[in-house]
Structures are given as structure tokens and as C-alpha cells.
Amino acid sequence: MGPERDSIDADEAGYSLAHLAEVLFACLDATGARSVAEIGAERGALTRELLAWAARGGARITTIEPLPGPEILELVEEHPELELVSEESHDALRHIAIPDALIVDGDHNYYTVSEELRLIDERAPGAELPLLMLHDVGWPNARRDTYHAPDRIPEEHRQPLVRRAALVPGEPGVAHAGLRYEWAAEREGGPANGVLTAIEDFVERREGVRLAIVPGFFGLGIVWHEDAAWASAIAEVVVPWDRNPVLERLEAYRVANLVERYRHAQELGEIEIMRRERERHAEQEQILRAMLASRAFAWGERLSRLRKGGRPTFTREQVRRALGEDA
């Protein structure tokens, strides 16, 4: 799940894993996957493509989404074969049948991803590890946590937070404008911070587990065990994409352009707010000046003096001071 939209179209911005469908489905085909679970469906763009892919070969699709939106519920109505698990991933992974492949695109922080990987590994260790494809292993989530609901993360596993944080490439802190997240880590980098950090730590602690990175559309991490029956087939698919320097440069340019558009949209929004404030103040000033010139105001001031023993509730002098004029 991506940042707040700030008036920029989500599909155009490239938030959905559906933009990496060619790589995803090539990997699924290489493993001969007959069951796929998707963690985090958002608006269902990838879910719809997964269902179309599954229909061609008779595969089963499970979507794990604790708060399914109307698009997902509509897909369930249209496709009774789609299994919807309305639970947090850490709960669902304890009891669902471990599929042949998992696509992980849920809450993008170290704790959540580490726990998802741990739970999968506990139930399918070694060469039984399913194919894992994880989104947002590139900037900004590679080395920085973001949170949908920080209170669900144990305090000792939360980074210091900033609300409505604006993130910009090359800035390890936060900026005035950029890709804006409701909750993000105050700083980029360091231990136990970010999606890619979580995956690298998982891979480093386990023999025979490999990681490839497709550096496009916020980055796709592909994890598999080298002793899996389909390991060589997966390697053949992903090696040309893995950390491809041309793709890395293209993604850097794409992100820079996207951030600039976000910044421009936010600055235009701020200008519009200032314009409305000026209009409101001008209207208030016009009303106050009309009041000063009215006989009704003069009578109201005199009546107030009489009722308040010579100390009226309001006076011309007070209104003039409010207008910035000498009393």
C-alpha cells in the first residue's frame, strides 16, 4: 500500500503490484504454482489479474485483507472461487494452508514483514519454503518503516514516528513536501528499519535462501530456497531482472518525477488554502468597515454603554484596532 494520494492517480503513480504482473506471473508459471495467497489487496488491481491467471490453469487464490474495501467485496461477489480472509496477516498465517506462492504487500515495516516471514518459515521450513514475492523493497520503504496503524506494533519494535511525513529521495529525515505517509519512521536507515532490511535479515539467517530484487515500481523482492524443485526455473526468470542497473536508473528517474509532482500538488494546495484565507479576511474586513459606517452600529454601541455602566461590550476603537487602523 502506497502513500496518501494527494490528488495523483494511484495507477498512474505505479503503487499497485499489477504494474509488475509480467514478472509475477512468469515466476508463478516457473514454479507451477497451484495456490497463491496475496497479503494486502488494497483496491484489488492485482487480485483481478491473479483471478484471470488462475482461471487459465485452475489455481486457487486467497486474499488476506483485514479491512476489505468495496472493490474487494465486489470481486468476492463476482468470483466465488476467491477466498477472502479478513484477518491481520500475523493471524491468518497461523492457520491458512501454506500456498505454493505468497505475494506480500501489506504493512510496510520491519516488524510486520519480519513476523510474516518468520511465521511462513516456521510452517514451511527449508526447501518447503514457498515462493515469496514482496513489494516495496525499493525507496522509500527499503530502509524506512511506514505504518497503517502504529498502535498494532509493539512499542519496542516501533521506530520514532512522524505523522503525515513527507519523504523525498536523498533526505534521510522528512521534508516539507513529497510522498506523504500518515505514519513513517522519523529517519531512514539503521537496524530494524524498512522492508528490505527485514528481508535481508531473514535471508542472512537461513542457509540456502536466495533474494533477487526487481528495481521497478517501488521494487519487488523475490525469495526462494535453492533446494526447491523449481529453484533453477525461478533463477532463470529473475536473474536478468535482479538489480538490473538500467531498471535502477529508470526507477530513480520515475520516483524523482513522481515526488516532484506530489510536491507541486501539495504546494498548489497550500497556495489555494492561502488564497481562501485572504478572501475570508477580505470579506471580514469589508463587513467590519460596513459596520463602522452604519448607524445601527452607533446605536448598538450607545445602548451597550448604557447597559454596561459606561463600559460597552464593543466600541469603534476596538473594531479599528482589529482592522489595523489607529484608534
Residue ranges of predicted features:
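Boundary detector for helix-to-coil junctions that initiate low-complexity/charged tails
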Residues: E236-A327
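C-terminal substrate-binding/active-site "lid" region of AdoMet-derived donor-dependent transferases
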Residues: Y111-A231, D242-V255
